[in-house]
Regions:
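A hydrophobic, multi-pass inner-membrane permease signature
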Residues: 1-231
């Protein structure tokens, strides 16, 4: 429906009430033209790629290092699990998080978005459980051969837990690509740092307001469908 609506005639689509399985009226690419003639959409795509790459990369490092540390038979591991579990159930909240970011001087920067979305407690515990499932005999054999923590982690344990990390990376990627809420809080006025989803949210809202005017251009009604396909 969304794809067919995005290439339909705006006036005909506005009066159509059913599900579009074929283009309504004369097919047109007007909605896509209106989007891509604006340089802001390309800037938003660039920002989204930066956010996704930074979030996935940093999240991978944090999950691997944190998961490996939690999987080791060290004292106080149960207490650490308890702290992590509490943070998974009860977050600090938007205002305290914003105050921390503001104190660190990160508000208004891309780094604030990346740090907030890099990892979740669930992924960290998931990584620890995956590392703990690696046979202890394999790890001990590697250490007898002189392997240190980094070699054991990356060459012995990580390959055996790659399925878990693939799922984690995929979820992190999807979450980072679709994220817009943090950007609306930490970079609300700097459109040069907006991700594509926040840009689409503003464009769709502006399009709705435009259609409520006395003499709307019905071609712009296509934007709300075209931007979904583009995203």
């Amino acid at each position: 429906h969304v794809l067919m609506s995005s290439v339909s005639d705006g006036f005909s689509l506005l009066s159509y009430k059913g599900v579009a399985v074929v283009p309504i009226g004369k097919p047109t690419l007007e909605g896509y033209r209106l989007i891509f003639r604006d340089a802001s959409v390309w800037i938003s795509y660039k920002n989204t790629i930066i956010y996704v790459a930074g979030t996935v990369g940093l999240g991978f490092v944090l999950n691997v290092l944190g998961g490996y540390a939690l999987s080791q038979p060290t004292k106080g591991k149960g207490i650490m699990y308890g702290f992590l579990f509490v943070t998974m159930l009860f977050s600090g909240g938007i205002v305290p998080t914003y105050m921390v970011m503001n104190t660190l001087g990160l508000t208004g920067s891309r780094l604030s978005i990346i740090l907030l979305e890099a990892t979740q407690t669930f992924y960290l515990i998931f990584a620890a459980k995956a590392f703990a499932a690696v046979p202890l005999s394999t790890v001990e054999a590697a250490r007898i051969d002189g392997a240190g923590h980094l070699r054991v982690m990356f060459q012995i344990m990580l390959p055996q837990a790659k399925g878990m990390f693939f799922i984690t990376l995929l979820n992190t990627f999807v979450g980072a690509w679709n994220s817009w809420y943090n950007a609306s809080i930490y970079v609300p006025s700097d459109k040069t740092k907006w991700p594509i989803q926040l840009f689409i949210n503003e464009m769709t809202s502006a399009n709705v307001n435009f259609l409520e005017t006395a003499t709307p251009n019905y071609s712009r009604y296509l934007i709300q469908f075209a931007v979904i396909v583009v995203a």
